[in-house]
A protein has these predicted regions:
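Start-transfer (signal-anchor) and selected internal transmembrane alpha helices
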Residues: 1-20, 235-244
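Aromatic-anchored segments of alpha-helical transmembrane domains
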Residues: 10-12, 135-143, 194-198, 245-253
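Active-site lumenal/periplasmic loops and adjacent helix-entry segments of GT-C-fold
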Residues: 13-161
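Transmembrane-lumen/periplasm boundary regions of multi-pass, lipid-linked membrane glycan transferases
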Residues: 31-38, 42, 240-256
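Transmembrane alpha-helical segments
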Residues: 96-107, 162-174, 192-193, 209-220
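Membrane-interface transmembrane helices that cradle and orient dolichyl/undecaprenyl
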Residues: 113-116, 163-185
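Membrane-interface alpha helices of multi-pass inner-membrane proteins
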Residues: 181-202
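Perimembrane helix-loop-helix junctions
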Residues: 207-244
Length: 256
């Protein structure tokens, strides 16, 4: 597993470091120029709000723009170009491989704490499979190398990098648990993670709308069965489902 993760980290990092003449050389694309100016504007103005933090780039007008990436990068010491390069390296070679590892571990059951002798054999096989997928992920150009280099759509890439974590939390939510405290913690973490994905870039709302329905349907069906014998249980679930749909519709309309 460590070998697969090492390949997933080393290959994209090596590609970026060998292509750039130096960390202070900005990517020669339009979006990179805008994002570098956004980092400088946040540092000078001291405002990283998504609702007006980049007003200096819009002739003083307060407009919506996802500034999570720029706000985080602006906290690092150094001029905008090298700290942005460091951010590109961190997301491409650290955040995404670890995010992918978490999703694969959850999907294959490697995060399970207890295992029988038979399960241990299967666990070793799954570990090898996950390590192979991690190593092969370094050869995928579509993400994160393309958005982080040739396109320089860094806020969007940050939003996509957070999606595996949300899916892991979705899967944990649909599992039965006896502790209401644990379930409440998972709900709060899921809301925070989903909110972070949307805050990083508005298209995160659309991505969540595409990825969430299978998990939500499974969760609602299981809750429907459990609440069937309770008075008012089904009505409460229907109300929650309607409210969720309304929130998605209103959010999609606002982000259009």
């Amino acid at each position: 597993l460590a070998a697969g993760l090492t390949v997933a980290v080393a290959v994209p990092a090596g590609v970026i470091l060998t292509v750039l003449p130096g960390p202070g050389y900005p990517a020669q694309v339009f979006d990179a120029t805008f994002h570098l100016n956004a980092v400088a504007a946040i540092r000078e103005g001291g405002n990283a709000s998504m609702l007006g933090g980049l007003s200096a780039l819009y002739s003083g007008r307060a407009v919506y723009y996802p500034t999570v990436w720029h706000g985080v990068v602006a906290l690092a010491p150094g001029s905008p170009a090298p700290v942005s390069t460091a951010g590109v390296l961190a997301l491409t070679a650290v955040v995404w491989p670890l995010s992918l590892l978490g999703l694969l571990a959850r999907a294959t059951g490697l995060d399970a704490t207890r295992a029988s002798e038979t399960d241990r054999v299967h666990r070793r096989q799954r570990t090898c499979a996950v390590a192979a997928v991690l190593a092969l992920s370094a050869a995928v150009v579509g993400f994160p190398l393309l958005p982080m280099t040739a396109l320089a759509v860094w806020p969007y890439a940050l939003s996509v990098a957070g999606l595996p974590g949300v899916l892991v939390l979705y899967d944990q939510l649909r599992q039965e648990t006896a502790s209401w405290r644990l379930r409440l913690t998972l709900v709060l973490l899921t809301l925070a993670a989903a909110g972070g994905v949307v805050a990083a870039h508005g298209t995160g709302l659309f991505n969540l709308a595409v990825l969430s329905p299978p998990f939500l349907v499974n969760l609602l069906v299981s809750r429907w069965r459990r609440c069937a014998a309770r008075r008012g249980g089904r009505a409460l679930l229907v109300a929650a489902a309607v409210a969720s749909v309304l929130v998605l519709v209103v959010g999609a309309w606002g982000m259009r």
